[in-house]
Amino acid sequence: MKILVSGFDPFGGETVNPAYEAVKLLPDTIAGAQIIKLQVPTRFALSGTVLEAAVNEHRPDAVICVGQAGGRSAITPERVAINLADASIPDNAGDQPVDEPIRKDGAPAYFTSLPVKAMVQKMRAAGIPAALSYTAGSFVCNSLMYTLLYLIDRQYPAMRGGFIHVPYAMEQAGNKPLGTPSMELHQIARGLALAVEAVVENERDLTVNR
């Protein structure tokens, strides 16, 4: 099995992005699956293009995109991406779309095809804070997840894909308001590795209450 894992570059004035920093810490093989690591730009117009090129090149069995969700206290696999770009801040190219569709010919929303409940269960069993999320927002993270699932729907129906949001890394919390949630980078990476294991072990998601 081959799994592509992507993470974003820093944005919003940050000097690091825990998404790609954690992805870089992943081993090259997890549970027998080959791990391909990819950095994507935090740019509406370019992130999907970079990811699509990597998908076309490597033809992975599954794709896990990872992004930062500052303010969250747990690792949160996303269930759904919506066809909406509505940015509260500019991306790294200065683009700030308002109420724009990501794909004019796309569905209103796409659901993840990753075993997100199994991911959460596996991380929690290891003592890592994790929870399902039902909103990927409307910034570049949601845009990338939507673009991936659109690509899978149109071209790669056997491929599985989705998105995971991670908290701030601890080194980012120093200049944030007191009490801002953060997580140690190695713990984030451990959580992502367990999420990958869940993908390898579960062709379909668990049927359990969240």
Would you name each region that the model predicts?
Residues 1-136, 149-158, 180-191, 196-210:
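N-terminal catalytic or cofactor-binding beta/alpha core of small enzyme domains
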Residues 47-49, 142-143, 173:
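Short, solvent-exposed polar/charged micro-motifs at secondary-structure junctions
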Residues 124, 148, 160-161, 166-173:
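C-terminal folded domains that constitute the principal catalytic or ligand-binding module
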Residues 137-141, 166-168:
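Small/polar glycine-rich anion-binding or flexible loop at a beta-alpha turn
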Residues 142-150:
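Hydrophobic, aromatic-enriched interface-forming segments
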Residues 174-178:
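Short acidic, glycine/proline-rich loop/turn micro-motifs
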